[in-house]
Structure formats: structure tokens, C-alpha cells
Amino acid sequence: MPTTANRSREQSRASWQLPDGVSRGTWDYVTEPAIAIDYDRFHAGHPLLELDRKLIEAHLGPSPTRSDGSSRIAVDLGCGTGRNLIPLANLGWRVVGVDLSLDMLGQFKSKAKSHVQSQPVAIRANMAHLECLADGFADAVLCMYSSLGMVQRRENRRSLMKHARRILTSNGTFFVHVHNRGSWLRDPGGVRRTIMDWLRARRNSNWELGDSVYAYRGLPSMFLHIYSERELRRDLNASGLVIKNLYRLNRHSSEILTGTWLAHLRSGGFLAVCTRH
């Protein structure tokens, strides 16, 4: 873990010193210890966390081994405290957690020590630059709970997707969740917000339609990019990924949306299950 002096230097980095794809708000988030320490308690009971776990489990199946008898490997990009990886490790998977937050990785390793026999691999890395990960070794790559949306600028989000494709085995599976900006149109002032966001994106090359900056857990400028379904499909396809299932989630992300009528407005988010081209 970083010393107090090193942590202070990290937290005070100038904006021009931040890694690609990392906004000031995201940097504040990943360098604030309290965010990681309180993460599990803060998010406990959120329905999406149970829903995505069940969907991942259903698609990956019960077997932790490949046809040659070796253990299957799962990589979680933006792993946080390891909520997706620890259940897989308990089944016998080998797991790799990737996060920009040293404090999140520390929480992940601490939890794993208490819950699983084999220690996971924990890697600090920028989601836009994952060259540290080898080609074709992962049976599953996860990027859940809108971790993709925390990456600033489209080219950096596509870079993450391309790396996910690259590290997958030939029959591996990529899971990704994003929030849906179409649901804005149902909110009071949502139409105006969408129009103003579109105009801002036209005038400011550093702003993209779907970008959002807001106060969050004591941080003044948390960043999140919120997708449309069409944008998500285009980015996955451009990154060499084939969508096998795209689940539209209900407004509260507690279950899969039923019916297709005005789904782009009714859905609170999307969970895509993909393979390589």
C-alpha cells in the first residue's frame, strides 16, 4: 500500500498528469481510501449486483475446468473489492482482478484470503491500457456495474473492449454492463437535458453525448459515460466483439425488462454477453 507521502502526491496530480481515460473525478475516486473501505457496505442490497451475478453464473456454467483439465481463468476489469471474482474462485476458477485503485485491490486480496484457498492475482492498471495482459488466456472477461462508463472518451472505452477481446480465448466470453441514457427522457427535464448535452458535445471536443459529471460520496465531480443501446452495439462491433445476448434491464436494474415496446426509454441499463469475431 502507498505511504502517506506517496498517496498525497498521487491525489494531488495535475489534470494534465492523469492517465488516458481517467477524469479528475475518477482519479479522486480511485485514490480515496474511504471509497474502497466502505464499498461493500455502501452497495449492499443493490439489486443489480445479484442480477448480474446470476447472469454470469448462468452463462459460464458450473464447471471450473477446461476440456484439458486445467482451471478456467476469469479477469475482472474494474474488479473493485472482488464481488464477482470471489464466487468464481470458490468454484475453482483462477481469477485476476484489475483495478486502478490500490485500495480496492487491497480490499479484494484481504477478502480473498478469508474466503478462498488460492490467492488471486491483483493488478493495478489503467483500463485504457491493458498491454500488461497476455493474449488469449482468459475464459471470461468481466466489466460490470458500469465500470466501462467510468472511462473517459470513446477511443479509450473502445480500447478497453479491444483489450478484452484480445485476452479472451477463442471461445471465451465478455460480459459488460452500462447504464442507458434513453431513460433520461422519462425524467422531469430529461428532454431538455438530452438536447443541452447534445449541443455541448457539438461545441466542446472534450465532451461527448452521454457524459455526466455529478457529486458522489463526497466527491464533487464524479464522471460517468452513459450509453445508448446503439452506441454500445457499435462500440462492441468495432472492437471485434459479437453480441450473443443483450439484456435490457428494467428501470431499477432489478430484473430483465419484459417486452420490447419503447425499450430504449424503459430500460435502466444493458448487460451484453459477447464472444470474439
Place the predicted regions along the sequence by residue.
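Conserved class I S-adenosyl-L-methionine
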Residues: P2-G69, S71-G78
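Core SAM-dependent methyltransferase catalytic element
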Residues: G259-H277
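SAM-dependent methyltransferase
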Residues: F175-D235, N245-H252
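A short glycine-rich, Lys/Arg-flanked "PGG" loop and its adjoining helix->strand segment in the class I
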Residues: R158-S170
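A short SAM/SAH-binding and catalytic strip from SAM-dependent methyltransferases
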Residues: A140-E155
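A short acidic, Gly/Pro-enriched loop at the edge of an enzyme's catalytic core
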Residues: C132-V141
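Class I SAM-dependent methyltransferase SAM/SAH-binding core
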Residues: G82-H129
